[in-house]
Amino acid sequence: MMLRVSSSPAAAVANHLSGGAAATTAPARVTAQRSGVSLSAAAAAGKGKEVLSGVVFQPFEEIKGELALVPQSPDRSLARHKFVDDCEAAINEQINVEYNASYAYHSLFAYFDRDNVALKGFAKFFKESSDEEREHAEKLMEYQNKRGGRVRLQSIVAPLTEFDHPEKGDALYAMELTLALEKLVNEKLHSLHGVATRCNDPQLIDFIESEFLEEQGEAINKVSKYVAQLRRVGNKGHGVWHFDQMLLQEAA
């Protein structure tokens, strides 16, 4: 027969104290957990701060190499950067091409503006073409200066002054000359683009493509249609006169 021993008052007190300790440990555990979360958050924040403040680009260190390249001589360009001599020379050549084309168109303008030719529409077309080619030359000159190059103008060849043709007449012959000249200018632009590509100059490549090549293609297409139309109307008479009137009324 087993006797059930009841807890002594001391044991009861101990149990009570033990229960009280357990009761008090729960809030302590929560507090500890909360502290752990706070510490984790702080650690994460510290880690993030470490990543954000990680040194990747040190401008004042890396700039030392570029600073040494800034020219001190007053006769040298301060803006020039990654612009080689071949590109500079090719741009000067293209400037000369554009000025020669402008000069040729100006001669055509003078011919058709004569009192004994008197095709005012053709004169207007060639005057506008001359102005456009000159603007192209000036645009190239501005770009040359912007990149730190030096503009060196070259000689311009004296153009033809007479454009009458025994078989084709002056109107068709002049427009065929124009088509050939536009294609030649386009070839020169492609050559300039090739130099820029070979020299790995993406800025010059973008400039040629965005400012010249698309417009040049449109000009070739436009003049091609003029040649086709003039071949249909014949080289003299009312057909040429009506074509001249169309050019006179056409917007630039």
From Swiss-Prot:
UniProt key word Oxidoreductase: yes
Keyword Oxidoreductase: yes
Cited Pfam families: Ferritin
Membrane-traversing stretches: none
GO cellular component: chloroplast; cytoplasm
Domain of life: Eukaryota
GO BP term, example: iron ion transport
Keyword annotations of the record: Chloroplast, Iron, Iron storage, Metal-binding, Oxidoreductase, Plastid, Transit peptide
Substrates-to-products reaction catalysed: 4 Fe(2+) + O2 + 4 H(+) = 4 Fe(3+) + 2 H2O
Range of the transit peptide: 1-43
InterPro entries in the record: Ferritin, Ferritin-like, Ferritin-like_diiron, Ferritin-like_SF, Ferritin_CS, Ferritin_DPS_dom
Residue ranges of domain Ferritin-like diiron in the record: 81-234
Enzyme Commission numbers on file: 1.16.3.1
Disulfide feature: none
UniProt GO molecular function: ferric iron binding; ferrous iron binding; ferroxidase activity
Enzyme class: oxidoreductase
Chain positions recorded as Fe cation 1 binding sites: 98, 133, 136
Subunit structure, as described in the record: Oligomer of 24 subunits. There are two types of subunits: L (light) chain and H (heavy) chain. The major chain can be light or heavy, depending on the species and tissue type. The functional molecule forms a roughly spherical shell with a diameter of 12 nm and contains a central cavity into which the insoluble mineral iron core is deposited.
Function text: Stores iron in a soluble, non-toxic, readily available form. Important for iron homeostasis. Has ferroxidase activity. Iron is taken up in the ferrous form and deposited as ferric hydroxides after oxidation.
Family: Belongs to the ferritin family.
Protein name (record): Ferritin-2, chloroplastic
Gene source species: Zea mays
Species classification: Eukaryota, Viridiplantae, Streptophyta, Embryophyta, Tracheophyta
